């Protein structure tokens, strides 16, 4: 078995391997850090490489923390019945992973989101690492596995739901019975797919 396979097996169920202790010590530092922070190298090298990461110029890895659970809605100031306040049990039509990708893209407007993966969670928040690519960098333009990102059609991928997590949230990972309202898009079918 290769080194990547050992790492992959350890991360499958972190609670049953050495990853549990690593995460426990790492999260103590992560909680004190800003919500979006650039990291020198990926925490999960196997997953990062599987999703397109290479240790070369023009590629950046960012760790993003996002709150867990449903949407945090402000309480209305004027009087209302408690049943009609609409504060609790309100969920976004978007996964937390997509929110993490969008925040990373907003922090680094000159970079495009390639992909992202989970690295940890506690009772309050989840952490994702987002792979970002500089589409104007010469080493990216000359690399066949990345230069498709240089086209204008891939601008703002994260906010348009064109990443892997975005397509999953839009229902484009599935086909057949039950997905009639998913294509061409959710909005084209008056949001009946959601």
From Swiss-Prot:
SMART domains: Ribosomal_L15e. The keyword Ribosomal protein applies. Residues 160-194 are annotated as: Disordered. InterPro entries: Rbsml_eL15_core_dom_sf, Ribosomal_eL15, Ribosomal_eL15_arc, Ribosomal_eL15_CS, Ribosomal_uL23/eL15/eS24_sf. PROSITE patterns: RIBOSOMAL_L15E. The keyword Translocase does not apply. Gene3D superfamilies: Ribosomal protein l15e (3.40.1120.10). GO terms for biological process: cytoplasmic translation. Pfam families: Ribosomal_L15e (PF00827). It comes from the Archaea. One of its GO terms (molecular function) is RNA binding. Keywords: Ribonucleoprotein, Ribosomal protein. GO terms for cellular component: cytosolic large ribosomal subunit. Belongs to the eukaryotic ribosomal protein eL15 family. PANTHER family: LARGE RIBOSOMAL SUBUNIT PROTEIN EL15, RIBOSOMAL PROTEIN L15. NCBIfam families: PRK04243.1. This is Large ribosomal subunit protein eL15. It comes from Methanococcus maripaludis (strain C7 / ATCC BAA-1331).
